[in-house]
Amino acid sequence: MRISRREKRKQWIAGAFGVCAAVVADQLTKELAYRNLKLSGKGFATLIPGVLELRYLENRGAAFGMLQNRLPLFILFAAAVSLAAVICYIRVPDSRRYLALRVCMAGLTAGAVGNLIDRIFRGYVIDFIYISLIHFPIFNVADICVSLSAGLLLILMLFVYRDGELEIWTRSGSQDGKDEKKG
């Protein structure tokens, strides 16, 4: 079932607002980490002993610190992911059924843009959230956006959408998620 123009406009505004809010939250928390952890000389703060800490880290690599010092590659990759997510957002059929898919694309865009801003203006990504309980790699708000969106996207693809239903990336014309038959 297609949505009304008004509903579509609301989804677009909500998506744009969500991306902007997530990017602002990411950049603000990174700036707070920079000022309160790095500049103060502390480097870390314990929030919940044995569970959650804030640890300042300048990540010059990819996810979880892999592939260090490949800045041009990471800038290109983050820009490509952002562009691909926006294109997918645009191509998602106008139906409430695909709202979760739009949320995934918005989250991927926000996360990619948040870390892209760091790479362009700092030359590295600020990571600061550390779950000491499980010794998980240090991460940031943008990483949360990407990870949650990718996880939800995987769940949607495996359990919600049927085979062929997500051909929206390769097909032109159809806006309701159903194959168009010609001839």
Locations of regions flagged by a protein language model:
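Alpha-helical transmembrane bundles and membrane-interface segments of multipass inner-membrane proteins
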Residues: M1-G183
